[in-house]
Amino acid sequence: MKAVVCTPGQKDSVRVIDMERPRCGPGEVLVRVHSIGVDGTDEEINEGLYGEAPEGCDFLVIGHEAVGIVEESGAGVRCTRPGDVVVATVRRPCPERCLNCRNHQPDFCLTGDYLERGIKGLHGFMAEYYTESMDYVIQLPRELLDTGSLLEPLSVVEKGIRESLRVQQRMLWEPRRALVLGAGPLGLLATFILRDMGLDVYTLATRERTSPKARVAEVSGARYIDVGEEPLDTLPEKHGPFDIIVEATGYSPYAFRAMELVNRNGVVCLAGLSPKKKDHALCTDCINMSMVLDNKAALGTVSASRRDFEKGVDRMLSIRNKWPGLLESLFTKKESLDSAPRALRRTKEDIKAVVVAT
């Protein structure tokens, strides 16, 4: 079968190779891949900045945002059958089986020794087929086949917002207005989720208000703001207060500024990564005073557990019902497996690249 691989630590190593098709073992399903989303992690692996090959292998099959169709079920599998649409979760428990991994929450792994499909120590899904234990397979309705690769990134945001709401159970809290920083895939999915929850949502990004990203955000009823026209610091007075802010750019000054700008008793959810490790000048006293005196909270979120994937399925159906075609509009670049390396070279106008395997 065809598979898209990288050599971790080696820049621009992405390539298509032939591999033996995996065989389905007991308790597993063989999945024929339909499509795979491409994200920044895949690009960073190809840049040699990240990624870990499976033990005994010098390459890594990339891709962790895949939807496919069950082709074969192994012995003991009773909850799925050939023809079912499925998505596999990404993170696997650490070998030490820490408390959270034993509790089916490897996204909160205590040791950091977890494995991740297509990222850390396990081959991913950017291939014609993969096998997976039923413990990590989520079923989707057939109508989500063409957008199912969005479930994994959506589950990450779903988790972050769920955890933010859980933190806010510390008091009586009725959020009305949200600010999302960033209009990449995570930012737009956060916009959709918060709009689906009934909040007034403002999405701030660098592209012009006539850009595809702006149009997609506004289809959901959000207000798109070009940061070149309205800087972040001006937004609370003009459009706020913001009860929840989701930071999805990875630009760390925004993360810390959000802690100052969020409403009294509000919460900031940090979903963007900052891999460049740059130093920035900040008024740390200002941030601390604001957080303490106004009872604010901030939390980070990464990966997701099974319940977030399952909630994500319901969320995608709700978004699909309210705004038909909205999820599909995120796919602005499509490639085949043979041309998959091109999917890792996105422009600033691209929202989401997807590799269509079948």
Curated annotation (Swiss-Prot):
Binding-site residues, Zn(2+): 39, 64-65, 152
SUPFAM superfamilies reported in the protein's UniProt record: GroES-like, NAD(P)-binding Rossmann-fold domains
GO biological process terms, semicolon-separated: non-phosphorylated glucose catabolic process
CDD domains linked: glucose_DH
Pfam family, one: Glu_dehyd_C
EC number(s) from the headed UniProt entry: 1.1.1.47
Catalytic activity: D-glucose + NAD(+) = D-glucono-1,5-lactone + NADH + H(+); D-glucose + NADP(+) = D-glucono-1,5-lactone + NADPH + H(+)
Keywords recorded for this protein, A-Z: Carbohydrate metabolism, Metal-binding, NAD, NADP, Nucleotide-binding, Oxidoreductase, Zinc
Signal peptide: none
Residues where substrate binds: 41, 116, 152
Superkingdom, natural source: Archaea
EC top class named in words: oxidoreductase
InterPro entries in UniProt: ADH-like_N, ADH_Zn_CS, Glc_1-DH_arc, Glu_dehyd_C, GroES-like_sf, NAD(P)-bd_dom_sf
Listed Gene3D superfamilies: Medium-chain alcohol dehydrogenases, catalytic domain (3.90.180.10), NAD(P)-binding Rossmann-like Domain (3.40.50.720)
Family affiliation: Belongs to the zinc-containing alcohol dehydrogenase family. Glucose 1-dehydrogenase subfamily.
Function: Catalyzes the NAD(P)(+)-dependent oxidation of D-glucose to D-gluconate via gluconolactone. Can utilize both NAD(+) and NADP(+) as electron acceptor. Is involved in the degradation of glucose through a non-phosphorylative variant of the Entner-Doudoroff pathway.
Name of the protein described by the UniProt record: Glucose 1-dehydrogenase
Organism, scientific name: Methanocella paludicola (strain DSM 17711 / JCM 13418 / NBRC 101707 / SANAE)
Upper classification of the organism: Archaea, Methanobacteriati, Methanobacteriota, Stenosarchaea group, Methanomicrobia
Gene from which the chain derives: gdh
